[in-house]
Protein backbone atom coordinates (compact mmCIF):
# COMPACT_ATOMS: atom_id res chain seq x y z
CA UNK A 1 0.00 0.00 0.00
CA UNK A 2 1.16 3.50 -0.70
CA UNK A 3 -0.14 7.00 -0.15
CA UNK A 4 1.27 10.45 -0.67
CA UNK A 5 2.88 10.23 2.77
CA UNK A 6 4.04 6.61 3.22
CA UNK A 7 4.31 3.07 1.84
CA UNK A 8 3.25 -0.04 3.75
CA UNK A 9 3.36 -3.83 3.65
CA UNK A 10 2.23 -6.63 5.94
CA UNK A 11 3.60 -9.60 7.88
CA UNK A 12 1.22 -12.41 8.80
CA UNK A 13 2.24 -14.53 11.80
CA UNK A 14 1.18 -18.06 10.89
CA UNK A 15 3.84 -20.30 12.43
CA UNK A 16 2.03 -21.45 15.57
CA UNK A 17 0.90 -25.00 16.19
CA UNK A 18 -2.41 -24.11 17.77
CA UNK A 19 -2.18 -26.65 20.58
CA UNK A 20 -5.64 -25.79 21.89
CA UNK A 21 -7.18 -26.83 18.56
CA UNK A 22 -6.28 -30.48 19.28
CA UNK A 23 -5.58 -31.05 15.60
CA UNK A 24 -2.64 -32.23 13.52
CA UNK A 25 -3.48 -29.51 11.03
CA UNK A 26 -1.79 -26.10 11.52
CA UNK A 27 -4.14 -23.60 13.12
CA UNK A 28 -4.18 -21.28 10.10
CA UNK A 29 -5.44 -24.16 7.93
CA UNK A 30 -8.45 -24.90 10.12
CA UNK A 31 -11.49 -24.61 7.81
CA UNK A 32 -14.14 -21.92 7.81
CA UNK A 33 -16.98 -22.58 5.37
CA UNK A 34 -14.73 -24.85 3.34
CA UNK A 35 -11.74 -22.48 3.16
CA UNK A 36 -8.58 -22.36 5.32
CA UNK A 37 -8.61 -19.65 7.97
CA UNK A 38 -5.53 -17.97 6.51
CA UNK A 39 -7.27 -17.33 3.20
CA UNK A 40 -9.67 -14.93 4.90
CA UNK A 41 -6.75 -12.91 6.24
CA UNK A 42 -5.29 -12.72 2.73
CA UNK A 43 -8.69 -11.62 1.47
CA UNK A 44 -8.63 -8.63 3.84
CA UNK A 45 -5.00 -7.65 3.18
CA UNK A 46 -4.59 -8.19 -0.57
CA UNK A 47 -6.60 -5.13 -1.67
CA UNK A 48 -4.54 -2.92 0.66
CA UNK A 49 -0.99 -4.22 0.32
CA UNK A 50 -0.80 -5.79 -3.13
CA UNK A 51 2.21 -8.15 -3.13
CA UNK A 52 4.05 -6.65 -0.14
CA UNK A 53 2.78 -9.39 2.17
CA UNK A 54 5.03 -11.91 3.91
CA UNK A 55 3.70 -14.93 5.79
CA UNK A 56 5.80 -16.42 8.59
CA UNK A 57 5.25 -20.18 8.79
CA UNK A 58 6.69 -22.84 11.07
CA UNK A 59 4.61 -25.74 12.37
CA UNK A 60 3.26 -27.64 9.36
CA UNK A 61 5.07 -25.29 6.99
CA UNK A 62 4.88 -27.69 4.05
CA UNK A 63 1.15 -28.12 4.57
CA UNK A 64 0.65 -24.36 4.49
CA UNK A 65 2.74 -23.98 1.34
CA UNK A 66 0.79 -26.77 -0.35
CA UNK A 67 -2.56 -25.22 0.58
CA UNK A 68 -1.57 -22.02 -1.25
CA UNK A 69 0.67 -23.49 -3.95
CA UNK A 70 -1.49 -22.04 -6.74
CA UNK A 71 -1.29 -18.51 -5.33
CA UNK A 72 1.53 -15.98 -5.50
CA UNK A 73 2.51 -15.95 -1.81
CA UNK A 74 5.84 -15.20 -0.16
CA UNK A 75 6.64 -17.31 2.89
CA UNK A 76 9.29 -16.89 5.59
CA UNK A 77 10.26 -19.93 7.66
CA UNK A 78 10.50 -19.72 11.45
CA UNK A 79 12.37 -22.96 12.10
CA UNK A 80 11.90 -22.85 15.87
CA UNK A 81 8.69 -21.39 17.27
CA UNK A 82 10.17 -19.03 19.87
CA UNK A 83 7.29 -16.57 20.01
CA UNK A 84 5.64 -13.81 18.01
CA UNK A 85 8.56 -11.40 18.50
CA UNK A 86 10.97 -13.97 17.12
CA UNK A 87 8.63 -14.61 14.18
CA UNK A 88 8.75 -10.92 13.31
CA UNK A 89 12.55 -10.97 13.59
CA UNK A 90 12.60 -13.80 11.03
CA UNK A 91 10.74 -11.64 8.51
CA UNK A 92 12.47 -8.34 9.27
CA UNK A 93 15.18 -8.62 6.61
CA UNK A 94 12.44 -8.95 3.98
CA UNK A 95 10.64 -5.95 5.43
CA UNK A 96 13.68 -3.66 5.48
CA UNK A 97 14.85 -4.77 2.04
CA UNK A 98 11.48 -3.81 0.55
CA UNK A 99 11.97 -0.17 1.48
CA UNK A 100 8.47 0.28 2.93
CA UNK A 101 7.86 2.87 5.65
CA UNK A 102 5.33 0.95 7.74
CA UNK A 103 4.57 -2.73 8.24
CA UNK A 104 1.31 -4.18 9.46
CA UNK A 105 1.75 -7.24 11.68
CA UNK A 106 -1.29 -9.47 12.10
CA UNK A 107 -1.94 -12.96 13.40
CA UNK A 108 -3.06 -15.54 10.87
CA UNK A 109 -5.89 -16.61 13.16
CA UNK A 110 -8.03 -13.47 12.69
CA UNK A 111 -10.21 -14.61 9.77
CA UNK A 112 -12.99 -12.06 10.27
CA UNK A 113 -10.79 -8.96 10.11
CA UNK A 114 -12.15 -6.40 7.65
CA UNK A 115 -10.19 -4.04 5.40
CA UNK A 116 -11.90 -1.03 7.00
CA UNK A 117 -10.45 -1.97 10.40
CA UNK A 118 -6.97 -2.08 8.87
CA UNK A 119 -7.53 1.27 7.16
CA UNK A 120 -8.55 2.78 10.50
CA UNK A 121 -5.30 1.57 12.05
CA UNK A 122 -3.32 2.97 9.12
CA UNK A 123 -5.02 6.34 9.35
CA UNK A 124 -4.62 6.65 13.12
CA UNK A 125 -0.98 5.54 13.09
CA UNK A 126 0.80 6.25 9.81
CA UNK A 127 -1.61 9.04 8.96
CA UNK A 128 -0.64 10.87 12.15
CA UNK A 129 3.06 10.04 12.02
CA UNK A 130 3.02 7.70 15.03
CA UNK A 131 5.77 5.09 15.41
CA UNK A 132 3.74 2.18 16.80
CA UNK A 133 0.01 1.55 16.63
CA UNK A 134 -2.14 -1.41 17.56
CA UNK A 135 -5.84 -2.22 17.77
CA UNK A 136 -7.43 -2.61 21.19
CA UNK A 137 -10.80 -4.00 22.27
CA UNK A 138 -12.73 -3.67 25.51
CA UNK A 139 -14.30 -6.95 26.65
CA UNK A 140 -16.45 -7.94 29.60
CA UNK A 141 -14.27 -11.03 29.94
CA UNK A 142 -10.67 -10.37 28.79
CA UNK A 143 -9.92 -14.11 29.16
CA UNK A 144 -6.44 -15.01 27.90
CA UNK A 145 -5.85 -11.88 25.81
CA UNK A 146 -2.96 -9.52 26.49
CA UNK A 147 -3.93 -6.59 28.73
CA UNK A 148 -3.36 -2.98 27.69
CA UNK A 149 -1.83 -0.91 30.49
CA UNK A 150 -2.33 2.84 30.29
CA UNK A 151 -0.79 5.65 32.31
CA UNK A 152 -2.75 8.92 32.32
CA UNK A 153 -4.70 7.72 29.29
CA UNK A 154 -1.61 6.89 27.25
CA UNK A 155 -0.49 3.37 26.37
CA UNK A 156 2.34 2.22 28.62
CA UNK A 157 2.61 -1.50 27.87
CA UNK A 158 0.86 -4.68 26.78
CA UNK A 159 1.13 -7.51 29.31
CA UNK A 160 0.24 -11.09 28.42
CA UNK A 161 -2.51 -12.52 30.62
CA UNK A 162 -0.30 -15.17 32.20
CA UNK A 163 2.29 -12.52 33.12
CA UNK A 164 -0.12 -9.93 34.51
CA UNK A 165 0.54 -9.12 38.18
CA UNK A 166 -1.90 -6.71 39.84
CA UNK A 167 0.70 -5.84 42.49
CA UNK A 168 3.09 -4.72 39.78
CA UNK A 169 0.77 -3.50 37.04
CA UNK A 170 -2.27 -2.28 38.97
CA UNK A 171 -5.95 -3.30 38.68
CA UNK A 172 -6.54 -5.63 35.76
CA UNK A 173 -8.03 -3.71 32.81
CA UNK A 174 -10.70 -4.93 30.40
CA UNK A 175 -8.93 -3.34 27.44
CA UNK A 176 -7.09 -6.02 25.49
CA UNK A 177 -4.65 -6.21 22.61
CA UNK A 178 -6.25 -7.55 19.41
CA UNK A 179 -2.86 -8.60 18.03
CA UNK A 180 -2.89 -6.26 15.02
CA UNK A 181 0.01 -3.78 14.86
CA UNK A 182 1.34 -1.09 12.58
CA UNK A 183 5.06 -0.43 13.02
CA UNK A 184 7.22 2.31 11.58
CA UNK A 185 10.13 0.33 10.15
CA UNK A 186 12.89 2.85 10.86
CA UNK A 187 11.72 3.41 14.44
CA UNK A 188 11.19 -0.24 15.36
CA UNK A 189 14.33 -1.72 13.78
CA UNK A 190 16.53 -0.77 16.80
CA UNK A 191 13.96 -2.28 19.19
CA UNK A 192 13.80 -5.82 17.80
CA UNK A 193 17.23 -6.90 19.12
CA UNK A 194 16.14 -5.73 22.58
CA UNK A 195 13.35 -8.31 22.89
CA UNK A 196 13.91 -10.88 25.65
CA UNK A 197 12.21 -14.11 26.70
CA UNK A 198 12.12 -13.34 30.43
CA UNK A 199 8.48 -14.30 30.90
CA UNK A 200 6.29 -17.24 31.94
CA UNK A 201 6.38 -18.80 28.46
CA UNK A 202 10.08 -18.32 27.75
CA UNK A 203 9.15 -16.75 24.40
CA UNK A 204 9.94 -13.49 22.62
CA UNK A 205 6.73 -11.45 22.62
CA UNK A 206 5.89 -8.92 19.93
CA UNK A 207 3.85 -7.14 22.62
CA UNK A 208 7.10 -6.08 24.33
CA UNK A 209 7.74 -3.74 21.40
CA UNK A 210 5.01 -1.49 22.80
CA UNK A 211 6.71 -1.04 26.18
CA UNK A 212 10.14 -0.66 24.57
CA UNK A 213 8.77 2.04 22.27
CA UNK A 214 7.27 3.91 25.23
CA UNK A 215 10.58 3.77 27.09
CA UNK A 216 12.40 5.11 24.04
CA UNK A 217 10.00 8.03 23.88
CA UNK A 218 8.41 6.91 20.63
CA UNK A 219 4.83 7.80 19.83
CA UNK A 220 2.49 4.85 20.49
CA UNK A 221 -1.19 4.77 19.51
CA UNK A 222 -3.74 2.34 20.95
CA UNK A 223 -6.55 2.40 18.39
CA UNK A 224 -9.75 1.50 20.22
CA UNK A 225 -12.33 -0.54 18.29
CA UNK A 226 -14.94 -1.18 20.97
CA UNK A 227 -15.82 -4.85 21.40
CA UNK A 228 -15.84 -5.78 17.70
CA UNK A 229 -15.96 -9.62 17.63
CA UNK A 230 -14.53 -9.69 14.11
CA UNK A 231 -11.13 -8.68 15.49
CA UNK A 232 -10.79 -11.55 17.96
CA UNK A 233 -8.38 -14.39 17.25
CA UNK A 234 -9.30 -18.06 16.99
CA UNK A 235 -7.54 -20.47 19.34
CA UNK A 236 -10.02 -23.24 20.22
CA UNK A 237 -12.68 -25.33 18.44
CA UNK A 238 -15.33 -23.27 20.24
CA UNK A 239 -13.83 -20.01 18.95
CA UNK A 240 -13.54 -21.51 15.48
CA UNK A 241 -17.23 -22.39 15.59
CA UNK A 242 -18.09 -18.87 16.78
CA UNK A 243 -16.12 -17.28 13.96
CA UNK A 244 -17.60 -19.59 11.36
CA UNK A 245 -21.13 -18.81 12.53
CA UNK A 246 -20.48 -15.06 12.39
CA UNK A 247 -19.03 -15.44 8.91
CA UNK A 248 -21.89 -17.69 7.76
CA UNK A 249 -24.51 -15.25 9.01
CA UNK A 250 -22.79 -12.29 7.33
CA UNK A 251 -22.57 -14.08 3.98
CA UNK A 252 -26.17 -15.34 4.02
CA UNK A 253 -27.44 -11.89 5.03
CA UNK A 254 -25.52 -10.30 2.15
CA UNK A 255 -27.15 -12.68 -0.35
CA UNK A 256 -30.60 -11.99 1.13
CA UNK A 257 -30.04 -8.25 0.69
CA UNK A 258 -28.98 -8.91 -2.91
CA UNK A 259 -32.30 -10.57 -3.75
CA UNK A 260 -31.58 -14.26 -3.18
CA UNK A 261 -34.46 -16.21 -1.62
CA UNK A 262 -33.02 -18.20 1.28
CA UNK A 263 -35.42 -20.41 3.24
CA UNK A 264 -34.43 -21.69 6.69
CA UNK A 265 -31.52 -19.26 6.43
CA UNK A 266 -30.05 -20.33 9.76
CA UNK A 267 -29.23 -23.75 8.30
CA UNK A 268 -27.66 -22.57 5.03
CA UNK A 269 -23.85 -22.49 4.68
CA UNK A 270 -22.42 -20.48 1.78
CA UNK A 271 -18.70 -20.10 1.11
CA UNK A 272 -17.15 -16.66 0.51
CA UNK A 273 -16.48 -17.23 -3.21
CA UNK A 274 -19.95 -18.53 -4.09
CA UNK A 275 -21.83 -16.30 -6.55
CA UNK A 276 -25.63 -16.34 -6.43
CA UNK A 277 -27.75 -14.18 -8.72
CA UNK A 278 -30.87 -12.36 -7.49
CA UNK A 279 -33.99 -14.48 -7.78
CA UNK A 280 -32.28 -17.80 -7.08
CA UNK A 281 -33.99 -19.94 -4.43
CA UNK A 282 -32.05 -21.80 -1.73
CA UNK A 283 -33.76 -24.14 0.74
CA UNK A 284 -31.93 -25.04 3.94
CA UNK A 285 -30.31 -27.00 5.21
CA UNK A 286 -27.76 -27.03 2.41
CA UNK A 287 -24.10 -26.21 1.79
CA UNK A 288 -22.54 -24.29 -1.10
CA UNK A 289 -18.76 -24.01 -1.31
CA UNK A 290 -15.82 -23.10 -3.54
CA UNK A 291 -16.28 -21.34 -6.87
CA UNK A 292 -19.94 -22.24 -7.20
CA UNK A 293 -22.30 -20.18 -9.37
CA UNK A 294 -26.09 -20.23 -8.98
CA UNK A 295 -28.05 -18.37 -11.64
CA UNK A 296 -31.27 -16.39 -11.37
CA UNK A 297 -34.40 -18.52 -10.80
CA UNK A 298 -32.28 -21.61 -10.16
CA UNK A 299 -33.58 -23.73 -7.28
CA UNK A 300 -31.56 -25.74 -4.78
CA UNK A 301 -33.71 -27.87 -2.51
CA UNK A 302 -32.86 -28.83 1.05
CA UNK A 303 -30.08 -31.22 2.09
CA UNK A 304 -27.92 -30.54 -0.98
CA UNK A 305 -24.11 -30.19 -1.01
CA UNK A 306 -22.52 -28.23 -3.85
CA UNK A 307 -18.89 -27.31 -4.54
CA UNK A 308 -17.17 -25.68 -7.53
CA UNK A 309 -20.25 -26.18 -9.70
CA UNK A 310 -22.40 -24.09 -12.05
CA UNK A 311 -26.18 -24.07 -11.82
CA UNK A 312 -27.41 -21.99 -14.73
CA UNK A 313 -30.49 -19.76 -14.52
CA UNK A 314 -33.65 -21.84 -14.23
CA UNK A 315 -31.90 -25.09 -13.30
CA UNK A 316 -32.95 -27.30 -10.39
CA UNK A 317 -31.06 -29.43 -7.89
CA UNK A 318 -33.51 -31.48 -5.88
CA UNK A 319 -33.29 -32.73 -2.31
CA UNK A 320 -30.39 -34.79 -0.97
CA UNK A 321 -28.18 -34.30 -4.04
CA UNK A 322 -24.40 -33.86 -4.21
CA UNK A 323 -22.60 -31.88 -6.93
CA UNK A 324 -18.87 -31.25 -7.29
CA UNK A 325 -17.23 -29.63 -10.34
CA UNK A 326 -20.48 -30.20 -12.20
CA UNK A 327 -22.74 -28.13 -14.45
CA UNK A 328 -26.53 -28.01 -14.69
CA UNK A 329 -27.93 -26.02 -17.61
CA UNK A 330 -31.12 -23.99 -17.87
CA UNK A 331 -34.21 -26.17 -17.49
CA UNK A 332 -32.21 -29.20 -16.43
CA UNK A 333 -33.14 -31.10 -13.26
CA UNK A 334 -30.96 -33.31 -11.07
CA UNK A 335 -32.20 -35.35 -8.15
CA UNK A 336 -33.51 -36.09 -5.68
CA UNK A 337 -30.65 -38.24 -4.39
CA UNK A 338 -28.42 -37.53 -7.40
CA UNK A 339 -24.64 -37.51 -7.34
CA UNK A 340 -22.81 -35.33 -9.83
CA UNK A 341 -19.09 -35.99 -9.64
CA UNK A 342 -16.38 -33.93 -11.38
CA UNK A 343 -17.08 -33.50 -15.08
CA UNK A 344 -20.81 -34.22 -14.89
CA UNK A 345 -22.80 -31.97 -17.24
CA UNK A 346 -26.55 -31.72 -17.76
CA UNK A 347 -27.42 -29.72 -20.85
CA UNK A 348 -30.66 -27.83 -21.33
CA UNK A 349 -33.79 -29.71 -20.19
CA UNK A 350 -31.85 -32.88 -19.35
CA UNK A 351 -33.12 -35.03 -16.48
CA UNK A 352 -31.06 -36.90 -13.91
CA UNK A 353 -33.25 -38.69 -11.38
CA UNK A 354 -32.94 -40.41 -8.05
CA UNK A 355 -29.93 -42.59 -7.31
CA UNK A 356 -28.16 -41.68 -10.54
CA UNK A 357 -24.40 -41.06 -10.46
CA UNK A 358 -22.45 -39.28 -13.18
CA UNK A 359 -18.72 -38.65 -13.59
CA UNK A 360 -17.05 -37.15 -16.66
CA UNK A 361 -20.35 -37.65 -18.42
CA UNK A 362 -22.72 -35.44 -20.41
CA UNK A 363 -26.49 -35.67 -20.73
CA UNK A 364 -27.22 -33.72 -23.90
CA UNK A 365 -30.31 -31.57 -24.43
CA UNK A 366 -33.48 -33.34 -23.27
CA UNK A 367 -31.73 -36.63 -22.43
CA UNK A 368 -33.00 -38.59 -19.43
CA UNK A 369 -31.51 -40.95 -16.87
CA UNK A 370 -34.33 -41.17 -14.39
CA UNK A 371 -33.19 -43.66 -11.79
CA UNK A 372 -30.65 -46.18 -10.49
CA UNK A 373 -27.93 -45.56 -13.07
CA UNK A 374 -24.16 -45.04 -13.28
CA UNK A 375 -22.81 -42.98 -16.18
CA UNK A 376 -19.04 -42.59 -16.24
CA UNK A 377 -16.89 -41.34 -19.14
CA UNK A 378 -20.01 -41.13 -21.26
CA UNK A 379 -21.66 -38.85 -23.82
CA UNK A 380 -25.43 -39.26 -23.94
CA UNK A 381 -27.06 -37.77 -27.04
CA UNK A 382 -29.97 -35.38 -27.01
CA UNK A 383 -33.37 -36.89 -26.11
CA UNK A 384 -31.84 -40.28 -25.41
CA UNK A 385 -33.46 -42.33 -22.64
CA UNK A 386 -31.42 -44.36 -20.18
CA UNK A 387 -33.43 -47.06 -18.41
CA UNK A 388 -33.25 -47.87 -14.72
CA UNK A 389 -30.26 -49.94 -13.66
CA UNK A 390 -28.09 -49.03 -16.65
CA UNK A 391 -24.33 -49.05 -16.05
CA UNK A 392 -21.50 -47.84 -18.25
CA UNK A 393 -18.68 -50.28 -17.48
CA UNK A 394 -15.88 -47.79 -18.08
CA UNK A 395 -12.94 -49.31 -16.16
CA UNK A 396 -11.08 -52.45 -17.21
CA UNK A 397 -8.82 -52.51 -14.17
CA UNK A 398 -6.11 -50.43 -15.85
CA UNK A 399 -7.67 -47.78 -18.08
CA UNK A 400 -10.91 -45.85 -18.39
CA UNK A 401 -12.92 -46.08 -21.63
CA UNK A 402 -15.73 -44.00 -23.10
CA UNK A 403 -19.31 -44.81 -23.96
CA UNK A 404 -21.10 -42.78 -26.64
CA UNK A 405 -24.88 -42.96 -27.03
CA UNK A 406 -26.53 -41.25 -29.99
CA UNK A 407 -29.49 -38.91 -29.95
CA UNK A 408 -32.94 -40.42 -29.30
CA UNK A 409 -31.41 -43.81 -28.49
CA UNK A 410 -33.28 -45.96 -25.97
CA UNK A 411 -31.38 -48.06 -23.45
CA UNK A 412 -33.55 -50.66 -21.72
CA UNK A 413 -33.46 -51.25 -17.99
CA UNK A 414 -30.69 -53.23 -16.32
CA UNK A 415 -28.28 -52.85 -19.24
CA UNK A 416 -24.49 -53.04 -18.95
CA UNK A 417 -22.60 -51.07 -21.61
CA UNK A 418 -19.04 -52.40 -21.66
CA UNK A 419 -16.79 -49.57 -22.86
CA UNK A 420 -15.39 -48.66 -25.24
CA UNK A 421 -18.72 -48.90 -27.02
CA UNK A 422 -20.96 -46.74 -29.17
CA UNK A 423 -24.74 -46.83 -29.48
CA UNK A 424 -26.08 -45.17 -32.63
CA UNK A 425 -28.82 -42.62 -33.12
CA UNK A 426 -32.35 -43.92 -32.48
CA UNK A 427 -30.91 -47.34 -31.63
CA UNK A 428 -32.73 -49.58 -29.16
CA UNK A 429 -31.05 -51.81 -26.59
CA UNK A 430 -33.22 -54.47 -24.99
CA UNK A 431 -33.56 -54.63 -21.23
CA UNK A 432 -31.10 -56.84 -19.41
CA UNK A 433 -28.49 -56.75 -22.17
CA UNK A 434 -24.72 -56.80 -21.81
CA UNK A 435 -23.48 -54.77 -24.77
CA UNK A 436 -19.86 -55.32 -25.80
CA UNK A 437 -20.04 -54.29 -29.47
CA UNK A 438 -21.09 -51.10 -31.21
CA UNK A 439 -24.75 -50.73 -32.20
CA UNK A 440 -25.38 -48.84 -35.44
CA UNK A 441 -27.98 -46.13 -36.02
CA UNK A 442 -31.54 -47.45 -35.81
CA UNK A 443 -30.53 -51.00 -34.86
CA UNK A 444 -32.06 -53.16 -32.13
CA UNK A 445 -29.54 -54.92 -29.90
CA UNK A 446 -30.41 -57.73 -27.51
CA UNK A 447 -27.66 -59.54 -25.62
CA UNK A 448 -29.17 -61.76 -22.96
CA UNK A 449 -29.87 -65.42 -22.33
CA UNK A 450 -32.97 -66.88 -23.99
CA UNK A 451 -35.84 -67.47 -21.60
CA UNK A 452 -36.90 -71.08 -21.13
CA UNK A 453 -40.12 -72.00 -19.32
CA UNK A 454 -40.42 -75.43 -17.69
CA UNK A 455 -43.53 -77.10 -16.35
CA UNK A 456 -43.48 -77.07 -12.59
CA UNK A 457 -43.32 -80.59 -11.08
CA UNK A 458 -44.44 -81.80 -7.68
CA UNK A 459 -40.90 -81.71 -6.24
CA UNK A 460 -39.59 -78.61 -8.00
Curated annotation (Swiss-Prot):
<keyword id="KW-0963">Cytoplasm</keyword>
<feature type="binding site">
    <location>
        <begin position="13"/>
        <end position="16"/>
    </location>
    <ligand>
        <name>UDP-N-acetyl-alpha-D-glucosamine</name>
    </ligand>
</feature>
<dbReference type="InterPro" id="IPR050065">
    <property type="entry name" value="GlmU-like"/>
</dbReference>
<feature type="binding site">
    <location>
        <position position="177"/>
    </location>
    <ligand>
        <name>UDP-N-acetyl-alpha-D-glucosamine</name>
    </ligand>
</feature>
<dbReference type="InterPro" id="IPR038009">
    <property type="entry name" value="GlmU_C_LbH"/>
</dbReference>
<feature type="binding site">
    <location>
        <position position="78"/>
    </location>
    <ligand>
        <name>UDP-N-acetyl-alpha-D-glucosamine</name>
    </ligand>
</feature>
<comment type="similarity">
    <text>In the C-terminal section; belongs to the transferase hexapeptide repeat family.</text>
</comment>
<feature type="binding site">
    <location>
        <position position="385"/>
    </location>
    <ligand>
        <name>UDP-N-acetyl-alpha-D-glucosamine</name>
    </ligand>
</feature>
<dbReference type="Pfam" id="PF12804">
    <property type="entry name" value="NTP_transf_3"/>
</dbReference>
<feature type="region of interest" description="N-acetyltransferase">
    <location>
        <begin position="259"/>
        <end position="460"/>
    </location>
</feature>
<feature type="binding site">
    <location>
        <position position="359"/>
    </location>
    <ligand>
        <name>UDP-N-acetyl-alpha-D-glucosamine</name>
    </ligand>
</feature>
<comment type="subunit">
    <text>Homotrimer.</text>
</comment>
<feature type="binding site">
    <location>
        <position position="235"/>
    </location>
    <ligand>
        <name>UDP-N-acetyl-alpha-D-glucosamine</name>
    </ligand>
</feature>
<keyword id="KW-0460">Magnesium</keyword>
<dbReference type="InterPro" id="IPR025877">
    <property type="entry name" value="MobA-like_NTP_Trfase"/>
</dbReference>
<comment type="pathway">
    <text>Nucleotide-sugar biosynthesis; UDP-N-acetyl-alpha-D-glucosamine biosynthesis; UDP-N-acetyl-alpha-D-glucosamine from N-acetyl-alpha-D-glucosamine 1-phosphate: step 1/1.</text>
</comment>
<keyword id="KW-0012">Acyltransferase</keyword>
<dbReference type="GO" id="GO:0009245">
    <property type="term" value="P:lipid A biosynthetic process"/>
</dbReference>
<dbReference type="InterPro" id="IPR011004">
    <property type="entry name" value="Trimer_LpxA-like_sf"/>
</dbReference>
<comment type="similarity">
    <text>In the N-terminal section; belongs to the N-acetylglucosamine-1-phosphate uridyltransferase family.</text>
</comment>
<protein>
    <recommendedName>
        <fullName>Bifunctional protein GlmU</fullName>
        <ecNumber>2.7.7.23</ecNumber>
        <ecNumber>2.3.1.157</ecNumber>
    </recommendedName>
</protein>
<keyword id="KW-0548">Nucleotidyltransferase</keyword>
<feature type="binding site">
    <location>
        <position position="431"/>
    </location>
    <ligand>
        <name>acetyl-CoA</name>
    </ligand>
</feature>
<feature type="binding site">
    <location>
        <position position="27"/>
    </location>
    <ligand>
        <name>UDP-N-acetyl-alpha-D-glucosamine</name>
    </ligand>
</feature>
<keyword id="KW-0677">Repeat</keyword>
<feature type="binding site">
    <location>
        <position position="160"/>
    </location>
    <ligand>
        <name>UDP-N-acetyl-alpha-D-glucosamine</name>
    </ligand>
</feature>
<dbReference type="GO" id="GO:0071555">
    <property type="term" value="P:cell wall organization"/>
</dbReference>
<dbReference type="InterPro" id="IPR005882">
    <property type="entry name" value="Bifunctional_GlmU"/>
</dbReference>
<dbReference type="GO" id="GO:0003977">
    <property type="term" value="F:UDP-N-acetylglucosamine diphosphorylase activity"/>
</dbReference>
<dbReference type="GO" id="GO:0009252">
    <property type="term" value="P:peptidoglycan biosynthetic process"/>
</dbReference>
<dbReference type="GO" id="GO:0006048">
    <property type="term" value="P:UDP-N-acetylglucosamine biosynthetic process"/>
</dbReference>
<feature type="region of interest" description="Pyrophosphorylase">
    <location>
        <begin position="1"/>
        <end position="237"/>
    </location>
</feature>
<feature type="binding site">
    <location>
        <position position="109"/>
    </location>
    <ligand>
        <name>Mg(2+)</name>
    </ligand>
</feature>
<comment type="function">
    <text>Catalyzes the last two sequential reactions in the de novo biosynthetic pathway for UDP-N-acetylglucosamine (UDP-GlcNAc). The C-terminal domain catalyzes the transfer of acetyl group from acetyl coenzyme A to glucosamine-1-phosphate (GlcN-1-P) to produce N-acetylglucosamine-1-phosphate (GlcNAc-1-P), which is converted into UDP-GlcNAc by the transfer of uridine 5-monophosphate (from uridine 5-triphosphate), a reaction catalyzed by the N-terminal domain.</text>
</comment>
<keyword id="KW-0511">Multifunctional enzyme</keyword>
<keyword id="KW-0961">Cell wall biogenesis/degradation</keyword>
<comment type="pathway">
    <text>Nucleotide-sugar biosynthesis; UDP-N-acetyl-alpha-D-glucosamine biosynthesis; N-acetyl-alpha-D-glucosamine 1-phosphate from alpha-D-glucosamine 6-phosphate (route II): step 2/2.</text>
</comment>
<feature type="binding site">
    <location>
        <position position="341"/>
    </location>
    <ligand>
        <name>UDP-N-acetyl-alpha-D-glucosamine</name>
    </ligand>
</feature>
<dbReference type="InterPro" id="IPR029044">
    <property type="entry name" value="Nucleotide-diphossugar_trans"/>
</dbReference>
<dbReference type="GO" id="GO:0008360">
    <property type="term" value="P:regulation of cell shape"/>
</dbReference>
<feature type="region of interest" description="Linker">
    <location>
        <begin position="238"/>
        <end position="258"/>
    </location>
</feature>
<dbReference type="GO" id="GO:0000287">
    <property type="term" value="F:magnesium ion binding"/>
</dbReference>
Amino acid sequence: MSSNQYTAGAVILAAGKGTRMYSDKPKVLQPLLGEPMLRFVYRALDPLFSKAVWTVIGHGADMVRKAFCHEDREFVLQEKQLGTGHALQCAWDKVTASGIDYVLVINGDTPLVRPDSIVRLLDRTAGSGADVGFITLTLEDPAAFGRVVRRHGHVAAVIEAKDYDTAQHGPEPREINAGIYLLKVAAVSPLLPLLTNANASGEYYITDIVELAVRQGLRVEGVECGNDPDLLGVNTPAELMRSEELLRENIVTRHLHNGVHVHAAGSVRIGPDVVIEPGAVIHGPCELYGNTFVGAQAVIDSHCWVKDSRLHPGSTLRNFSHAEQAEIATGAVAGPYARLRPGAVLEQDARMGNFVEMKKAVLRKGAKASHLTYLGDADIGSEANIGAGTITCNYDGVNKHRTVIGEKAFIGSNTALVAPVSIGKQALVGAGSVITKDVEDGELAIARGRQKNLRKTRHS
